[in-house]
Amino acid sequence: MNKQSLFENIKRKKSFLCVGLDTDIKKIPDHLLDDSDPIFAFNKAIVDATADYCIAYKPNLAFYESMGVKGWIAFEKTVNYIKENYPDQFIIADAKRGDIGNTSAMYARTFFEELDIDSVTVAPYMGEDSVTPFLSYEGKWVILLALTSNKGSHDFQLTEDANGERLFEKVLKKSQEWANDEQMMYVVGATQGRAFEDIRKIVPNHFLLVPGIGAQGGSLEEVCKYGMNSTCGLIVNSSRGIIYVDKTENFAAAARAAAKEVQEQMAEQLKAIL
């Protein structure tokens, strides 16, 4: 999916919502535990309930890998179900990979050849040769970690050099030498607030994947005020605030209502550019 197609989906749905599929076997409704594949059963119900109101899904690999083979099978089934039934949805493998070149090449092969996923999150710490293997696939996206929403972002990402330049700013500037805004996005946490203004000075045209609204306390209005550009330029993720709002047999309907509420807020924000 290219950048224009992504924007067309945003305009059509009046939404830039990504639903995070951080599916924890300990948090899903009890009645699903009797299913032969409870993780997939949960994901399928969530996807069916929310697809009208979002433009992307983001399975977090840690939640699937923690369950071994069964978890990976559920992940693959989820990806295939979305592709077959909702082909306009942008799929993000939230894997945060990044290693020496030949290892990254294997990660890239997994997500882009075997699974044919649209994008994967990548950690930039090891530099260009750890990222470029992911960039060799036409039509696929790298979503590079830039400024995250966790407290630990202060340990490295927000540290300044002698000239006052912060590490995340170096990442943004240097990585633009590796790919353009048709193949690279950046992760920027919603809790970073005014930092979006500084980020847009460096990457005015790139899409930003923004986790951290909802349960993590980020402000959608603030993200849009400082981060939205003429093609929206935002994919805002909500996980717990949608998928875990209800643990009864009505969980899917509750998730749909939560997604609809976020979509309606996003539709208001999009009026500034549509």
UniProtKB/Swiss-Prot annotation:
Enzyme class, spelled out: lyase
Alphabetical keyword list: Decarboxylase, Lyase, Pyrimidine biosynthesis
Entry keyword Zinc: no
Active-site residues, Swiss-Prot/TrEMBL: 96
CDD domains xref list: OMP_decarboxylase_like
Catalytic activity, as annotated: orotidine 5'-phosphate + H(+) = UMP + CO2
Enzyme Commission no: 4.1.1.23
Gene Ontology MF annotations: orotidine-5'-phosphate decarboxylase activity
Pathway(s) served: Pyrimidine metabolism; UMP biosynthesis via de novo pathway; UMP from orotate: step 2/2
Gene Ontology process terms (BP): 'de novo' pyrimidine nucleobase biosynthetic process; 'de novo' UMP biosynthetic process
Gene3D superfamilies, A to Z: Aldolase class I
Family listed: Belongs to the OMP decarboxylase family. Type 2 subfamily.
The protein's name in its UniProt record: Orotidine 5'-phosphate decarboxylase
Protein source organism: Bacteroides fragilis (strain YCH46)
Lineage of source species: Bacteria, Pseudomonadati, Bacteroidota, Bacteroidia, Bacteroidales
